[in-house]
Structures are given as structure tokens and as C-alpha cells.
Design a protein with these regions (language model features):
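Conserved active-site motif detector
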Residues: 1-142
Length: 142
């Protein structure tokens, strides 16, 4: 397998909480190939209480509440924490972007900002065998 086709992995996280996504889902300019392209957040296990509150609130539309990484965060390669905007409130941290896929999210935010839309990526919360997980519906930013 070619090194550029491998999914980025953070071995410090449990195998079922590393998130998912691949550069194969994007064109050369990090534009999603399909409207159905998703990116599953990593490190959601510690956030199960917050995710349960989101589900219990019954909010239909969820969007990310994140900003682009600062030069300091880029330099130290800090994890990109994700919060959700649900209705009228911003939640606590619900996960992080999988290692190596931060440029995909940065590009989606700048693409939304460039066309004059709010810099919020649609999201959904899914139930898995390992608990609640957050999928960013990044294909909808095309």
C-alpha cells in the first residue's frame, strides 16, 4: 500500500475511537468527492456525557463551532478540538479531528467563509457499539 493512501492514525487512542476519514475522499484541492463524504471524530469516548445531553435535547440541526487553527497551534501540532452548535448553545468538546486530517477541515472552513456562509460544518451524532460518535458531514460544504 502506498504511504499517501493510508489513513492517518493516532496510536495513543483506542482502536475504536481513532476516528475515520481518508484523503482518497477528496480531490486535489481538498474538495470532497461526494456530498455524502463524512469524517468521524476521534477521542469521543471521554465526551459520552456531553453527547448524551445533545441526544436528549432533541436538537435536529447540529453544526460545528470551531475556528481555524492559530499559527501557535499549527506549530505545536495541537489536536483540533470540536464543539457543536446545537440550537442556541455551544456544547463542550465532543471529539477531535483525526490526526493528519486537520487540513481538510481548515479548507472546508475557508471554503465556507469564501462564499459568505457561516463557517460551520454540518454534523450528526451516531450510536455505535462503542458509544456515541460524531460524524462531520463535510461533503455538504462542497
Amino acid at each position: 500500500m502506498d504511504f499517501w493512501n493510508r489513513s492517518p492514525v493516532d496510536p495513543s487512542l483506542p482502536k475504536d475511537d481513532r476516528g475515520s476519514g481518508s484523503f482518497n475522499d477528496y480531490k486535489y484541492n481538498l474538495l470532497p468527492n461526494s456530498v455524502r463524504t463524512t469524517l468521524r471524530l476521534a477521542n469521543s469516548t471521554p465526551c459520552q456525557d456531553e453527547l448524551q445531553r445533545i441526544i436528549d435535547s432533541g436538537e435536529g440541526e447540529l453544526e460545528t463551532a470551531i475556528s481555524r487553527r492559530s499559527p501557535e497551534e499549527e506549530r505545536t501540532d495541537a489536536p483540533m478540538d470540536i464543539r457543536l452548535f446545537s440550537g442556541s448553545r455551544v456544547t463542550g468538546v465532543v471529539g477531535t479531528i483525526p490526526r493528519g486530517l486537520e487540513p481538510v477541515v481548515d479548507e472546508a472552513l475557508s471554503r465556507l467563509d469564501g462564499v459568505g456562509k457561516k463557517a460551520r460544518i454540518p454534523a450528526s451524532v451516531q450510536k455505535t457499539r462503542s458509544g456515541w460518535r460524531v460524524d462531520l458531514l463535510i461533503g455538504q460544504t462542497r
